[in-house]
């Protein structure tokens, strides 16, 4: 049923309700895809609502990675507190430092790219 639906045919076989709802929200313009570029070159298409904050994006990245690991059987545990303590998310050279600030306030729109950049240590 889902495989034959043109709206949902891009979703994986072991799809979750959250992924179906995200895809529907995308189609209705209620959500956007942010392309998160990892340092190894992998691009993760992460779906967030239109008025999402930086914290919402971070949580969506965590959920995306968790689902991918469950499907592929990769590394079981990632210390996200370590990841966010060690790396910044950046967009067009600007660090996304404020978790409560909306993505649109940073100028991030649908299909924009966000990258990880290592934080410099404070002395």
UniProtKB/Swiss-Prot annotation:
Q: Which GO terms describe its biological process?
A: mRNA splicing, via spliceosome
Starting at the broadest rank, the lineage of the source organism is: Eukaryota, Metazoa, Chordata, Craniata, Vertebrata
Q: Name one Pfam family in it.
A: Ubiquitin_4
Q: Which UniProt keywords apply?
A: mRNA processing, mRNA splicing, Nucleus, Spliceosome
Gene Ontology terms, cellular component aspect? nucleus; U12-type spliceosomal complex
Domain Ubiquitin-like: start-end pairs: 32-123
The scientific name of the source species is: Mus musculus (Mouse)
Q: Which InterPro entries match?
A: SNRNP25, SNRNP25_ubiquitin, Ubiquitin-like_domsf
Protein name, as recorded: U11/U12 small nuclear ribonucleoprotein 25 kDa protein
Localisation: Nucleus
Subunit structure, interactors included: Component of the U11/U12 snRNPs that are part of the U12-type spliceosome.
């Amino acid at each position: 049923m889902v495989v034959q639906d043109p709206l949902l045919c891009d979703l994986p076989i072991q799809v979750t309700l959250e992924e179906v709802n995200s895809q529907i929200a995308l189609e209705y313009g209620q959500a956007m895809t942010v392309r998160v570029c990892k340092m190894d070159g992998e691009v993760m298409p992460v779906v967030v609502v239109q008025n999402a904050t930086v914290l919402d994006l971070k949580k969506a990245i965590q959920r995306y990675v968790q689902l991918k690991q469950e499907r592929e059987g990769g590394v079981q545990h990632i210390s996200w507190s370590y990841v966010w303590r060690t790396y910044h998310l950046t967009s067009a050279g600007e660090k996304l430092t404020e978790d409560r600030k909306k993505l649109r306030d940073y100028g991030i729109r649908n299909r924009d790219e966000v990258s990880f950049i290592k934080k410099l240590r404070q002395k």
